[in-house]
């Protein structure tokens, strides 16, 4: 169904080959997973298969690529999309309307499908993904995970026999990942061909027929299904990759030491309320105390209000009622950005420079010893070799590391990280863990909005569960048992 023979690709605006000498065959009905460190060429391979390289992302391609027996270079994009549908890493990049319902039916309308058939598909896909509560919502109101679901649903509306997915689980809560697993199993049982680019492998371990590892633009290892069940997490971690078993204990996963006990509060939230629409509250009386040294994992289902709470903490949103105190004194929204930093879920919103280096220099021109600090953080996050590249040419994982690096230079008393590891391999995740630990220290605090179980165990010393607009659990991370229970039963 998908055949690549000695395929190489180089973008026009970069000197190095993005992928080189890729030979790969995916048979009809197979589910093949491609993984590898951030920036290894996975997304470029994805773009070559769906025709966006070189038609949209300009560059030079060599070798041959066929899709369903047809030479890809001779096909129009519209012909390719009739065979293969794509779920992109950033779901917002494939939205064409402003509301959920319109966006779901748009692909079918664009292909001239009859109204009755569109309605039948809409009913089937909505039921499959449990989207009924979202149908009348605006896309701008959705959480990152909800947007991810809509992107997946719009692709399923096309009912193509080949489905390509780039990091489909990156913004999803645990139950939504379980649902995605069931959907992929259904598609596979019906003979769909699935090619999935992914860092988080645990939900695919039982489904995939082959796991392919890329490194520096090339395929370096391939694991057959029978072999995967015999491999522990440590072997993958040694390669800088995520493990296959989410809740398996391993030698590299450590519970972060608890912060030293102190009665001095850094930030206090009392009875915080907020809603985007009249008579619909997202936050319903939030009470939270944040202490120096806290590295808080803010967890909860998609759409529960985690990002909204994060934006209130840093002043991007103003609470509709309630009190926020800093060091026991009133802390109005208009001045919070001076003390609180924010790393957004969509990192493209925070990239402004013409190069990686310029992006870190921006706003830090007066920073003492700025050159040494910039080079140090570039080295810590393995970005030194990329410092002259334009930020838009980076992979999603590299972009995430860049905005985390910028937050390190700002050195705010409180930093909110919104899904900082969604595009990161295991090695990069550990580097980010170390940097957040350095940012927090003993005097600052960090709040990390995340669904990443491995990351929480490696980084956080406290977890807060947001549920039904209120904080329902708040506990120190002394071990993984309580966190594992919450992931399995309440996320």
Swiss-Prot record:
Which residues does the annotation say bind ATP 2? 300-307
Q: Record-annotated residues binding ATP 1?
A: 36-43
- Give Gene Ontology CC terms: ATP-binding cassette (ABC) transporter complex
Pfam families reported in the protein's UniProt record: ABC_tran
Annotated ABC transporter domain ranges read: 2-241, 267-491
Per UniProt, which keywords does this protein have?
Answer: ATP-binding, Cell inner membrane, Cell membrane, Membrane, Nucleotide-binding, Repeat, Translocase, Transport
According to the UniProt entry, its GO molecular function terms are: ATP binding; ATP hydrolysis activity; ATPase-coupled transmembrane transporter activity
EC numbers, comma separated: 7.-.-.-
Going by the entry's taxonomy, the superkingdom of the source organism is recorded as Bacteria
- What's its membrane topology? Peripheral membrane protein
Principal place of residence: membrane
The subcellular localization recorded is: Cell inner membrane
- Family per record: Belongs to the ABC transporter superfamily.
- What is the stated purpose of this protein? Probably part of an ABC transporter complex. Responsible for energy coupling to the transport system.
The record's PANTHER family line, in alphabetical order, gives: ABC TRANSPORTER ATP-BINDING COMPONENT (PTHR43553:SF23), HEAVY METAL TRANSPORTER (PTHR43553)
- Protein's UniProt name: Putative ABC transporter ATP-binding protein TDE_0906
């Amino acid at each position: 169904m998908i055949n690549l023979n000695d395929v190489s690709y180089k973008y026009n605006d970069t000197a190095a080959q993005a992928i080189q000498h890729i030979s790969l065959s995916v048979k009809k009905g197979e589910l093949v997973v491609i993984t590898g460190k951030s920036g290894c060429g996975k997304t470029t391979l994805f773009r070559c298969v769906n025709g966006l390289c070189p038609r949209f992302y300009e560059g030079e391609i060599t070798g041959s690529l066929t899709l369903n027996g047809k030479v890809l270079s001779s096909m129009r994009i519209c012909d390719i999309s009739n065979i293969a549908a794509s779920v992109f890493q950033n779901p917002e990049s494939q939205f064409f309307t402003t509301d959920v319902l319109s966006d779901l039916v748009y692909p079918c309308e664009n292909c001239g499908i009859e109204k009755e058939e569109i309605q039948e598909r809409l009913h089937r896909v909505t039921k499959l993904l449990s989207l009924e509560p979202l149908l009348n919502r605006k896309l701008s109101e959705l959480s990152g995970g909800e947007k991810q679901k809509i992107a997946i649903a719009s692709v399923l509306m096309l009912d193509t026999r080949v489905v390509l997915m780039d990091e489909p689980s990156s913004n999803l809560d645990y139950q939504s990942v379980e649902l995605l697993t069931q959907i992929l199993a259904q598609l596979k049982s019906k003979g769909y061909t699935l090619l999935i680019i992914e860092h988080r492998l645990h939900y695919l371990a039982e489904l995939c027929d082959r796991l392919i590892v890329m490194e520096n633009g090339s395929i370096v290892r391939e694991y057959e299904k029978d072999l995967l069940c015999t491999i522990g997490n440590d072997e993958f971690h040694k390669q800088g990759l995520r493990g296959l078993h989410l809740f398996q204990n391993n030698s590299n996963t450590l519970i972060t030491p608890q912060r030293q006990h102190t009665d001095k509060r850094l930030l206090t939230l009392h009875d915080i309320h907020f809603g985007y629409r009249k008579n619909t509250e997202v936050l319903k009386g939030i009470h939270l105390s944040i202490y120096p040294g806290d590295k808080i994992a803010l967890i909860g289902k998609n759409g529960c209000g985690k990002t909204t709470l994060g934006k209130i903490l840093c002043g991007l949103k103003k609470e509709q009622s309630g009190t926020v105190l800093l060091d026991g004194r009133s802390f109005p929204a208009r001045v919070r950005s001076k003390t609180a930093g924010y790393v957004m879920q969509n990192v493209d919103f925070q990239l402004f420079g013409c190069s990686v280096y310029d992006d870190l220099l921006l706003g830090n021109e007066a920073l003492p010893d700025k050159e040494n600090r910039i080079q140090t953080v570039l080295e810590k996050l393995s970005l030194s070799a990329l410092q002259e590249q334009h930020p838009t040419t980076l992979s999603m994982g590299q972009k995430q590391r860049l905005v985390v690096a910028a937050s390190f230079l700002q050195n705010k008393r409180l930093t909110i990280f919104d899904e900082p590891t969604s595009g990161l391999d295991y090695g990069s995740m550990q580097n980010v863990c170390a940097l957040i630990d350095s940012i927090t220290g003993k005097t600052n605090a960090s709040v990390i909005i995340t669904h990443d179980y491995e990351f929480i165990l490696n980084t956080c010393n406290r977890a807060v569960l947001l549920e039904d607009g209120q904080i329902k659990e708040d506990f120190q991370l002394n071990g993984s048992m309580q966190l594992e229970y919450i992931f399995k039963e309440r996320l």
